């Protein structure tokens, strides 16, 4: 009973944190459409928080090294997600029934779909453009998709590692790698100069909101330790 009560408290704390990050994302998005709008982007494209964004972009500049590194890490994160999709498909085939499939795996796939849909929505619902031209054209920039996807995938991967890997040294090592990746991509995208500061911040907020929702759900599953 004490263990179950503890898990419920942890789930409540996680969903509360998720709500905070989602609220921060919503506030940031609304402010980007209204606060300190300035034509500081390429081809005089307008950006919210223009003073802060331009200051940080001018100070950090651009880095081809960080761009290539974060691109590679982004592909690795997607490969990790695909690995979970394949593992879930194998388990589904082995169990021969979706009802016998571990709930945390089923819900993880649902969350992957949600994140993919969110990505597509923001590709169409333009908030602002990148601080650079891509192939000579303006491109949607908010939130940073690399940041959103990597933060979400790595945090949910940590949840899976904690639940499924029983070798403590291996679990610790893999979790540490996931944390490093989740941190280095947002920082790297900013240093690469391919996103405004608020793009990266929005990606972090939304990635954490969605991944913490998933973590909270897992805490509510009786057999998910």
Give the predicted meaning of each segment.
Residues 1-11, 91-103, 225:
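Membrane-interfacial, low-structure loops and terminal tails that flank and connect transmembrane helices
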Residues 2-80, 123-134:
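N-terminal transmembrane-helix/juxtamembrane module of multi-pass inner/ER membrane proteins
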Residues 6, 60-71, 96, 100, ...:
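Membrane-helix interfacial "entry" motifs
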Residues 7-16, 30-33, 134-225:
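Membrane-embedded catalytic cores of phosphoryl/pyrophosphoryl-handling enzymes
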Residues 23, 76-80, 108-120, 204, ...:
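Alpha-helical transmembrane spans of integral membrane proteins, capturing the lipid-embedded, hydrophobic core
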Residues 40-42, 88-173:
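Membrane-interface loops
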Residues 70-77, 106, 110, 145, ...:
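Alpha-helical transmembrane segments of integral membrane proteins
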Residues 80-88:
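Central hydrophobic cores of alpha-helical transmembrane segments in multi-pass inner-membrane proteins
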